[in-house]
Each structure stands twice: as structure tokens, then as C-alpha cells.
Amino acid sequence: MIFKFESGASTMHGISRRTFLKTASASAALAAAGVDASWLMANPLGLPLGLQLYSVRDLLPKDYEGTLKQLSAISYREVEAAGFFGRSAGDVKQLMTQAGLRCVSAHYSYPDLAPHLDEVIQFGKTLGLKYIICSSPGVPDGSAAKGADGKVNRDAMTLADWRWNAEQFNRIGERVNSAEIRFGYHNHTGEFRTQDGILLYDEVLRLTDPAKVTMELDCGWMIVGGKNPVDYLERYPTRFSLLHVKDFKMSGKPGSDKEPPPSAELGQGSIDYRPIFAAAKKAAIKHAFIEQEQYDMPPMEALKIDAEYFQALTV
């Protein structure tokens, strides 16, 4: 496995007509909403710079409004939520708008999502979400992957467990999509194991209806799990709508999100995003969210490094 992926494509300092049109459309929409879009061209995907708010999970409970404003000040324009800390959808929307941010997606674990789906959908509609993402799977009653505490061990899930999840995702996706929000699933590393000669993630892709379930590709976790995002973006160019962009200092062999390699700022670890972004530009990616799991410096300093790397990268 080569973690610094090599690309035979030459580096391009311009952008394609397709990327220009996508960028122009997004710029016009943001301008109509009163948001400065002058920064939009300065990144390799021609997309608003996004952040998964799990990256600031320790800061938001202490100063929600201030943290959002700090993120906006270092060029982030879109965010994906990972919890709302007891705030109402209206409150979150107002604070996002005041900070110059748009919350376009939100993560929910399966246990937080399935039993409360009507509430989640209504919250998302009020907030203006485009996506509701299942960030971790569930398991049926009796599954050995469910511990005594009710928590699911993804690395212990069987092929049958994942097939059950695909069925649930189709059901949930139909209901979410009827509210004009897209439903999707976000990977970690446990999906990239093989059982009975079948790669678990591939089985989820096979069994989920693309009209009901889109995919959020976490590039970092896929690589830690031993697979190459470029391969998946090329094989399934219409299945992925969102990316997670993170870096790790890899050991040279596949690992697990349970015992992950050390996190790194973008460009400081082992992952070369140029070929990944080149493949993403040819796929159906609509949003890209930087995410950093851990820090060895103040989070805002690290996230500024991440933002600057992302915006300066050429493919």
C-alpha cells in the first residue's frame, strides 16, 4: 500500500470548464445569500472550504458562537455538524449566519438517528441541511457486535450485520429524501475488512439504492483501512457526494480507527491528496470537509494550516 499516492497526471494551475461552471454557480448562490465568495476559486475542487465540526468538539461547548466566528475568520465557509449541544435548529441557523457559515450537513449515529428520524428530519429542514449522514452503523438485536453497554464494535460486525444496515439505510434514505434532504453514510475503517471473500464496504455499495443513499467518503479512514480513495472515486463516480479530508502519519500498513495512527495537519502526514482531488473533480463531489482528529498544537492554529494547505494545493 502506497500512502503517498503517486499520480501520472501533470499538475494544472488552471481549472477546467466543468470546474469553472460549478464554481461560478456556487459563487452566484453565495453572493445572492450575501456571502463573500471571492475565496472560492482558491482551492483545487472549486468548492467552499468546509470543516467537520468534530474537529472543534472541545471548543464548541465552551464558546459556540465565538468558535464559529474564529472558523470563519480562517476561511471556512461550510460546516458539517457533529452534535448541536442542546441548541435549537433556529438558534444554530442564526449563529451560523451571523458567523458567515452555512451548516450543510450533520452527522448522527444510527442509534441517535433511526428511533428519532422524524425529529431529525424536522431539525434538518429548519436548519437548512442538504445532507443527513449516518456516521456509524447499528446492528440488529442479538448481534455479537453489540456490547453489554449497547455500543457497537464496528470491527466485530459480520457480513449479515452490514447487509442489515444496507436495508435500514435504504428505508431511512427514502424518508429523508422525501423531505428534500439527501441521506448518506460515512465510512470508518471496519468496512474495509473481508468476510466470505466479500469486502464489506463493497457489499454496502451493492445493496444500497443510489437514489436513496449517497456516500460520504472519509479519505483518511479509508486509507488507514487499507484502501485507496482514488480507486473508489473512479469505480463509483456517482456514488459519493461528500469528502472528509484528513491526514495521518502512517506506519506503512493498514490499521483501525480504534487504534489510529497519529493525526497530522494536511500536508504534514503521509497522504498525498493531489491524485484524490484529481479523481474527485471527475466525480459527483458536492462538498469537502476538512477534519482533524487530534492535535499537538492549539486547534485553531492547526485548522488554519489545514485551510491554507487545502487552498494552495493544485491538481
Residues of each region from the PLM?
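N-terminal secretory signal peptides
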Residues: 1-15
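Acidic/histidine-rich catalytic cores of soluble enzymes
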Residues: 178-270, 277
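Active-site acidic/histidine proton-transfer and metal-coordination neighborhood
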Residues: 25, 78, 85, 102, ...
